[in-house]
């Protein structure tokens, strides 16, 4: 959720500083939205890589002889790595539809609350925290990680489509989504 808040703060920066008209005159709002998305996704990838490398020695030491680098990498990439783009796409789409920080924050918080409470028991709907209770060192984790990956990729495609739809609704010259 930190990256969702970071996305909303970055999107609201030009209107909060009252330089939105100047930025829109210098760079097309469509180009700015795409560049913002790429920058945030790049930051998320860098954060994931640094987190993965930072926790690697501690995890290998704590788990001991049963440590498997493949399971470690897959677990981080699926469980944490795909959550970052989901938050960025959701917050970016909410911002592009509403163009208001407070409404976008409420939308993201509502979907996060649904994922953590009501949708918790449905593995396909809990986008924020997948239904993975434990990973095994005796049996294969492939089925658990595969179902979590399917769930994450389904949400990733859905939120990418929602972001693309919101990209088409970027307001230019204050005319609104239909202008």
Q: Residue ranges of each PLM-predicted region?
A:
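Terminal transmembrane helical anchor/hairpin motif
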Residues: 101-179
